[in-house]
């Protein structure tokens, strides 16, 4: 499965810790991330990450394009609710597209862990049927 990972600046360390904790599960899938987040994940996990541009340079738009083409199966976007809203339209577009195309989406650690555990148990295999 193709997993999109994004983290606001204040959540990047949390994303690193999350990917360290679930490295074994994530290593069985393709990981896509915005530029800085992807680089930070690679540094601590040695996972291969397909990196988009940095989020503020269009990385979230690149992810959105893959969602529109049904090429992403799950998105974890660790958002900082206190973050400036400078690229909020891009964030809202990703949320809208995930809702439109029935792509599981998490914005916090609790939901992210539920999605990764579901992934581990095969509960998201229905995504493969949709892609055909």
Where are these regions (language model features)?
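Short, acidic/small-residue loops that bind anionic groups at enzyme active sites
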Residues: 95-115
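Short hydrophobic/aromatic-enriched beta-strand-loop microsegments
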Residues: 30, 47-58, 126-129
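Mid-chain, well-packed structural core segment of small domains
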Residues: 60-100
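Short, glycine-/small-residue-rich phosphate/pyrophosphate-handling segment
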Residues: 110-132
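Short internal beta-strands
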Residues: 28-37
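Histidine-anchored nucleotide/phosphate-binding helix
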Residues: 15-24
């Amino acid at each position: 499965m193709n997993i999109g990972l994004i983290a606001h600046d204040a959540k990047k360390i949390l994303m690193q810790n999350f990917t360290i904790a679930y490295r074994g599960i994530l290593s069985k899938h393709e990981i896509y991330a915005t530029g800085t987040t992807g680089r930070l994940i690679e540094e601590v996990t040695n996972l291969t990450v397909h990196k988009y541009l940095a989020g503020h340079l269009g990385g979230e738009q690149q992810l959105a394009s893959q969602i529109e083409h049904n090429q992403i199966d799950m998105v974890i976007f660790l958002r900082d609710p206190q973050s400036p809203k400078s690229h909020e339209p891009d964030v809202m577009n990703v949320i809208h597209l995930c809702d439109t195309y029935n792509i599981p989406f998490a914005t916090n650690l609790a939901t992210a862990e539920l999605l990764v555990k579901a992934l581990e148990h095969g509960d998201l295999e229905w995504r493969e049927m949709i892609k055909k």
